[in-house]
């Protein structure tokens, strides 16, 4: 996406259009008898800081699935690996409090908040001087922008298959984060996946997605390695290539690749 590294307030007309689409989608769900809850937004266009770092603005509150991992009755706040998303969990705290009060079986958990010091990143990794071919070599070797300084994971790197949790190892989730998930969910089997064809492996939904029991679509440019396919093949899951996106490039102001069409 051309938006990599960009931040700040979006044009009002794009905000109004997005809100219109969101309201229409919420209304459609309500007509079908689905309960729709909305997060409480913060002022994202403000500087934030911890004792270790500061950044000029926050990200937003569009994708709840990035922040909250729901497994059974538990809703787990992910660590997050972007400094600009460090406080994003606050948007969902009112809802989590509400669910906790409504359901005596609900568990609200939070993973250890990372410090995200410079030790957590290879600081020159995203330099514009580094070409795509070099990035593909790095991701094939599982060398990513995040280090193993502390556990890091985004909820959007996790796919749930009953008692199996498939977790993408990439930019936003490291091996310590995957190990933390294994310890936190002892009654689940946690598997690490990686996709060497992706130079910017962030979140699994535009790469690998289950459509129904027994059928998975995989981004044809980011195929799951043969060794990691075995668990699916042994359990009679079919992995097929996803259809090509309708567009060649993302729309203006979009942070995602065209392969978001898979979600």
Across the structure, where does each feature detected by a protein language model lie?
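The feature marks the mature, well-folded catalytic cores of soluble enzymes
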Residues: 1-263
């Amino acid at each position: 996406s051309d938006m990599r590294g960009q931040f700040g307030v979006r044009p009002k007309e794009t905000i109004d259009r997005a809100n219109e689409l969101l309201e229409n989608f919420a209304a459609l769900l309500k007509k079908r008898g689905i309960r729709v809850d909305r997060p409480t937004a913060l002022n994202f266009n403000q500087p934030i800081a911890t004792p270790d770092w500061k950044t000029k603005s926050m990200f937003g509150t569009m994708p709840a699935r990035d922040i909250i991992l729901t497994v059974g009755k538990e809703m787990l706040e992910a660590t997050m690996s972007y400094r600009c998303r460090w406080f994003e969990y606050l948007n969902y705290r009112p809802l989590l409090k509400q669910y906790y009060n409504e359901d005596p079986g609900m568990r609200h958990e939070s993973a250890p908040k990372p410090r995200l010091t410079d030790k957590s990143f290879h600081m020159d990794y995203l330099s514009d001087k580094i070409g795509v071919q070099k990035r593909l070599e790095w991701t094939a070797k599982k060398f990513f922008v995040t280090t193993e300084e502390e556990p890091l994971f985004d909820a959007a790197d996790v796919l749930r298959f009953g008692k199996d949790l498939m977790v993408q190892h990439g930019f936003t989730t490291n091996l310590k984060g995957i190990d933390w998930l294994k310890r936190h969910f002892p009654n689940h089997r946690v598997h690490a996946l990686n996709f060497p064809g992706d130079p910017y492996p962030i979140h699994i939904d535009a790469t690998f997605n289950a459509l129904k029991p027994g059928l998975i679509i995989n981004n044809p440019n980011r195929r799951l390695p043969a060794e990691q396919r075995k668990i699916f093949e042994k359990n009679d899951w079919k992995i097929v290539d996803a259809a090509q996106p309708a567009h060649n490039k993302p729309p203006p102001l979009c942070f995602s690749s065209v392969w978001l069409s898979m979600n």
